[in-house]
């Protein structure tokens, strides 16, 4: 006869009827009753009650307090004289950020927690829910780290076969790599599942919290703590942006997302992520504090998750293989964090000092010289012909000069 949609009740019957709807309060002491008398409703919705009024007394909707529709095409919306807990949630949809907004609002209302604690609890709950996907990704990355030397050998053979144009050797190398993946039960695509899912979750939380802070939702202006009492405004001391960037850097150095710091990462990628973490406060300093109430606990969870998964006994119970201590990357030089950071700083200050930039410049210069040599083949050929002719003429002259004279008897 009716269905609950988002924050309201939608009546779908096409005839006049009488409905009594009872909503039981959280503490079970009092009952809210909505009673209607033989009146057709096309769409009936009511706002959720505020946190302080969730155990209020009996609410009755009478004909005197509600304007009923004159035709079936009209919509009747009854809004009680109670403050809205969130005007953002007035329309429900199945988009990820709207689902998160409704979930956060429900958790805040029925738990009684302040907004900062509700957002942090939701962040931890989401990370626990994503942990099975992360565990699958960690197993795949650990197995790939173990078989990486063999795969690198086959890949070198494959690259040589491509350069030589040997199709048979290429087929053999690819089949050997595929068999190596099948024997070890490894699918490299599993490495993308957790980052993609976490990326979608982070973007959804970011958009949901940014929208709620932009309204702002009731309770956001005083739902924080200490110097960050207003969650709709950025951190005035910029402590959370800096601490969040340092936590991300700590996760990269410890390998928290892979469960082990023994899994090798290319130096260029590590430098890039280090620079991104150190530069992140410049881009996040104007974010509202509601976003950091999700982001900061999520990074703290990652640190504890990495420490939890570095234990050999826990890895054995979870079925995670042990990664060898030394997993070298071919043609890579392991550099310390201080050296890589100083390289980045000198590369920004003085052009050409950054090692990777100098390598790229050398490669481009080499390509330019090759293209210039290829563009002038006729001149080179004429020069070589001229040199050969001159050499031949000089040889003929020398032979004629050095020809021994015959003595007459």
UniProtKB/Swiss-Prot annotation:
A biological process from GO: protein insertion into mitochondrial inner membrane from matrix
Gene Ontology MF annotations: membrane insertase activity
CDD domains, alphabetized: 5TM_Oxa1-like
UniProt keyword annotations, A-Z: Membrane, Mitochondrion, Mitochondrion inner membrane, Transit peptide, Transmembrane, Transmembrane helix
Disordered, as annotated region: 369-409
InterPro entries: YidC/ALB3/OXA1/COX18, YidC/Oxa/ALB_C
Highest taxon above the source species: Eukaryota
GO CC entries: mitochondrial inner membrane; mitochondrion
Membrane topology term: Multi-pass membrane protein
Mitochondrial intermembrane side: 97-114, 210-235, 297-409
This protein's record includes keyword Mitochondrion: yes
Polar residues bias: start-end ranges: 374-403
Spans traversing the lipid bilayer: 76-96, 115-135, 189-209, 236-256, 276-296
Mitochondrial matrix side: 136-188, 257-275
Principal subcellular localization: mitochondrion
Pfam (any one): 60KD_IMP
Subcellular localization, as worded in the UniProt entry: Mitochondrion inner membrane
Functional note: Required for the insertion of integral membrane proteins into the mitochondrial inner membrane. Essential for the activity and assembly of cytochrome c oxidase. It is essential for viability while oxa101 is not. When both are deleted the cell is non-viable, suggesting that oxa101 act as a back-up for oxa102.
Family per record: Belongs to the OXA1/ALB3/YidC family.
Protein name: Mitochondrial inner membrane protein oxa1-2
Source species: Schizosaccharomyces pombe (strain 972 / ATCC 24843)
Gene responsible for this protein: oxa102
């Amino acid at each position: 006869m009716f269905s609950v949609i988002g924050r309201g009740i939608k009546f779908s019957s096409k005839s006049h009827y009488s409905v009594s709807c009872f909503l039981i309060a959280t503490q079970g002491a009092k009952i809210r009753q909505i009673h209607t008398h033989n009146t057709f409703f096309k769409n009936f919705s009511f706002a959720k009650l505020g946190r302080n009024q969730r155990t209020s007394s009996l609410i009755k909707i009478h004909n005197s307090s509600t304007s009923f529709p004159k035709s079936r095409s009209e919509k009747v919306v009854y809004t009680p004289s109670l403050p809205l807990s969130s005007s953002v949630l007035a329309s429900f949809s199945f988009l990820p950020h709207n689902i998160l907004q409704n979930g956060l609002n429900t958790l805040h209302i029925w738990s009684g927690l302040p907004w900062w604690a509700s957002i942090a609890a939701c962040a931890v709950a989401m990370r626990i829910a994503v942990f099975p996907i992360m565990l699958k990704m960690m197993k795949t990355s650990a197995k790939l780290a173990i078989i990486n030397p063999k795969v690198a050998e086959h890949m070198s053979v494959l690259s040589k076969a491509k350069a030589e144009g040997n199709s048979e050797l290429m087929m053999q190398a690819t089949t050997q790599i595929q068999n190596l993946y099948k024997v070890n039960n490894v699918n490299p695509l599993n490495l993308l599942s957790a980052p993609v899912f976490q990326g979608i979750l982070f973007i959804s939380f970011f958009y949901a919290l940014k929208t709620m802070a932009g309204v702002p939702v009731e309770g956001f202006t005083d739902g924080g703590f200490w110097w960050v009492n207003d969650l709709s405004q950025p951190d005035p001391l910029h402590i959370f942006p800096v601490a969040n960037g340092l936590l991300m850097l700590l996760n990269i150095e410890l390998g928290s997302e892979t469960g082990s710091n023994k899994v090798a990462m290319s130096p260029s990628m590590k430098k890039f992520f280090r620079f991104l973490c150190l530069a992140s406060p410049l881009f996040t300093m104007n974010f509202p504090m509601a976003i950091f109430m999700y982001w900061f606990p999520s990074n703290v969870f990652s640190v504890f998750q990495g420490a939890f998964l570095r234990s050999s006994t826990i890895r054995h119970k979870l079925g995670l293989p042990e990664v060898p201590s030394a997993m070298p990357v071919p043609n890579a030089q392991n550099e310390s964090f201080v050296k890589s950071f100083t390289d980045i700083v000198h590369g920004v200050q003085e052009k050409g000092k950054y090692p990777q930039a100098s390598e790229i410049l050398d490669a481009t210069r080499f390509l330019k010289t090759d293209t210039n040599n290829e563009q002038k083949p006729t001149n080179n050929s004429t020069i070589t012909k001229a040199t050969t002719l001159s050499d031949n003429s000089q040889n003929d002259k020398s032979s004629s000069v050095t020809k021994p004279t015959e003595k007459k008897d």
